[in-house]
Amino acid sequence: MARSKTSHRWLKEHFDDPYVKMAQKDGYRSRASYKLLEIQEKDRILRPGMTVVDLGAAPGGWSQVTSRLIGDRGRLIASDILPMDSIPDVTFIQGDFTDDAVFALLLEAIGEQPVDLVISDMAPNMSGVKAADQPRAMYLCELALDLAGRVLRPGGDFLIKIFQGEGFDQYLRQVREGFDKVQMRKPLSSRDRSREQYLLARGFRGA
């Protein structure tokens, strides 16, 4: 089957993308690494020795950045529905985050040690129909917030990809109830046409 004009356009944009070229040059698995690096440069959310949970981790761009910045004394637990090539000293749980059994496996892997930071770059498979995509995206955000509320230490931080639309304002209010400070970030490496933003919540108040 011949490729559509849309897929031709996507491929051209992808390979012309300066962040894709930078990722190939710098050894990162995806352009998403630069989104986290930009946020890190501004907000310094990652430090040596931290315990971090990375949701929606595949192919591993955020895990690569995180692992490097938390160092040998740090601990990183990552999860995705898709497989991810191993990264040294990273514990990876493959499975559907919306599945209770996978959620339980992730909690088991985290164990009793309080987590300093939960990061999530999760997004559902987009159909292009906003009325269908937005509720699925917000459901993943709700689950990520639930996990963060269970595992974060008091004072811990939460960074999550979120899409403007139905449910956004309610979610923002919910996050503000549990954290001291909430800010929105739109990295330069996030494509202009994308509705994605990153919500950064700092200073978890405790369960």
Swiss-Prot record:
Its EC number is 2.1.1.166. InterPro entries: RNA_methyltr_RlmE (IPR050082), RNA_MeTrfase_FtsJ_dom (IPR002877), rRNA-MeTfrase_E (IPR015507), SAM-dependent_MTases_sf (IPR029063). NCBIfam families: PRK11188.1. The active site is at K161. Its main location: cytoplasm. PANTHER family: RIBOSOMAL RNA METHYLTRANSFERASE, RRNA METHYLTRANSFERASE 2, MITOCHONDRIAL. Belongs to the class I-like SAM-binding methyltransferase superfamily. RNA methyltransferase RlmE family. It is found in: Cytoplasm. Keywords: Cytoplasm, Methyltransferase, rRNA processing, S-adenosyl-L-methionine, Transferase. Specifically methylates the uridine in position 2552 of 23S rRNA at the 2'-O position of the ribose in the fully assembled 50S ribosomal subunit. It comes from Azotobacter vinelandii (strain DJ / ATCC BAA-1303). This is Ribosomal RNA large subunit methyltransferase E. GO terms for molecular function: rRNA (uridine-2'-O-)-methyltransferase activity. HAMAP family: RNA_methyltr_E. One of its GO terms (cellular component) is cytoplasm. Pfam families: FtsJ. S-adenosyl-L-methionine binds at G60, W62, D80, D96, D121. It catalyses: uridine(2552) in 23S rRNA + S-adenosyl-L-methionine = 2'-O-methyluridine(2552) in 23S rRNA + S-adenosyl-L-homocysteine + H(+). It comes from the Bacteria.
